[in-house]
Amino acid sequence: MAEDFGFFSSSESGAPEAAEEDPAAAFLAQQESEIAGIENDSGFGAPAASQVASAQPGLASGGGSEDMGTTVNGDVFQEANGPADGYAAIAQADRLTQEPESIRKWREEQKKRLQELDAASKVTEQEWREKAKKDLEEWNQRQSEQVEKNKINNRIADKAFYQQPDADTIGYVASEEAFVKESKEETPGTEWEKVAQLCDFNPKSSKQCKDVSRLRSVLMSLKQTPLSR
């Protein structure tokens, strides 16, 4: 029993057994030591703390970390996504969106052609307006002349009609002047007499004419005995 207790006491009081060594960690440590030796041999060792502080004042003061690049072996390199790459991307987008030369020339030619067509259409429109105005003036002049000729011909025909031998027989006035003069008279009770002067009361023997004997008798009775108001 004493031996057993001695075994436990010795195991508890003694140093712990060494842990098993990790092969990967050992390999990495070996590689790091070799790289450090190569850098020391080539003169590219790690910079001193004062050099790092002087090279990166923004980091020492706690600001301006965004403006500084990446430090590798004491040299500062610009980040890949910095302002220079931004300008290059903008220039590339401009080149992509720029019109081809052929399309630009075609667009300019079309614009020039449309301007020429607009100018020609305006000139043609002005010519048509002037021609229409001239034609309208000529038509108005011809119309006025035709109206005057018709008036003269109508007066001649009226005079010839009123001067015919049977003008009094058919109940018409002898002349146009007398008819106008009588029509302007405002004698009460003579209205139906003026109407009767415009009517032909002679009976027609032609079978093609309509029978207006009843209307003639009504007009004759109104002429003799006008309506009393």
UniProtKB/Swiss-Prot annotation:
Membrane topology value: Peripheral membrane protein
Keywords: Acetylation, Calcium, Coated pit, Cytoplasmic vesicle, Disulfide bond, Membrane, Phosphoprotein
One Gene Ontology cellular component annotation held by this UniProt entry: ciliary membrane
Organism domain of life: Eukaryota
One annotated GO biological process: neurotransmitter transport
Pfam families noted in UniProt: Clathrin_lg_ch
Modified positions (Phosphothreonine) in chain numbering: 187
Cross-referenced InterPro entries: Clathrin_L-chain
Biased composition (Low complexity): 1-17, 45-58
Main location: membrane
Involved in binding clathrin heavy chain, as annotated region: 93-155
Phosphoserine sites (modified residues): 11, 13, 217
Disulphide bridges, residue numbers: 199-209
Compartments where found: Cytoplasmic vesicle membrane; Membrane, Coated pit
Positions of post-translational N6-acetyllysine modification: 204
GO molecular function: clathrin heavy chain binding; neurotransmitter transmembrane transporter activity; peptide binding; structural molecule activity
Claim: Acetylation is one of the keywords in the record: yes
Keyword ATP-binding: no
Subunit structure: Clathrin coats are formed from molecules containing 3 heavy chains and 3 light chains. Interacts (via N-terminus) with HIP1. Interacts with HIP1R.
Name of the molecule in the record: Clathrin light chain B
Species in which this protein is naturally found: Rattus norvegicus (Rat)
